Amino acid sequence: MFMGEYSHTMDAKGRVFIPARFREELGEKFIVTKGLDHCLFVFPQKEWKVIEEKIKALPFTNQDARAFVRLFFAGAAECEQDKQGRVLLPNHLREYAKLDKEVVIVGVGTRVEIWSQELWNNYCNGAQAAYEEIAEKMVDFLL
């Protein structure tokens, strides 16, 4: 399970270090795609297969389902770690997530998220203020 928050610097080539705690579970090759809230979602191959099966079950006759599937898969890229544990993020994904130099890599259970430091801070400030309210809404799912 992925958990924790790690700050890293992206180099000029668009490479970022994957935290050592995440490397083995992600595997040598993994999928990076557009996430929600302008972050990137990173899935190990086995988890990607699970997501892929669920998405394939969406009705293609539903306009929202078609839009989601198109954007989710069109933005996806298979990436791999180099020997130093870095991953080169494709330019279109860096642009989508507004990644510049300072990035935050967050473990979120079955996936990893990559955020720009600025967007992560903004997100946390807003979500932290509503944390208890969000928890109350989620209590049925948690228990």
Swiss-Prot record:
Question: Main location per UniProt?
Answer: cytoplasm
State the GO CC annotations: cytoplasm; nucleoid
Occurrences of domain SpoVT-AbrB (ranges)? 5-47, 76-119
Is Cytoplasm a UniProt keyword of this protein? yes
Among InterPro entries, the record links this protein to: MraZ, MraZ_C, MraZ_dom, MraZ_N, MraZ_sf, SpoVT-AbrB_dom, SpoVT-AbrB_sf
Among Pfam families, the record links this protein to: MraZ (PF02381)
BP terms from Gene Ontology: negative regulation of DNA-templated transcription initiation
Keyword annotations from UniProtKB, A to Z = Cytoplasm, DNA-binding, Repeat, Transcription, Transcription regulation
The record's GO molecular-function terms, alphabetically, read: DNA-binding transcription factor activity; transcription cis-regulatory region binding
- Is the keyword Cytoplasm in the record? yes
User: Could you say which residues form the signal peptide?
Assistant: none
Subcellular location(s) of the protein:
Cytoplasm, Nucleoid
HAMAP family xrefs: MraZ
Family of the protein in this entry:
Belongs to the MraZ family.
Against NCBIfam families, the record matches this protein to: division/cell wall cluster transcriptional repressor MraZ
Q: How does it assemble?
A: Forms oligomers.
- Protein name, per record: Transcriptional regulator MraZ
Which organism was this protein described from? Carboxydothermus hydrogenoformans (strain ATCC BAA-161 / DSM 6008 / Z-2901)
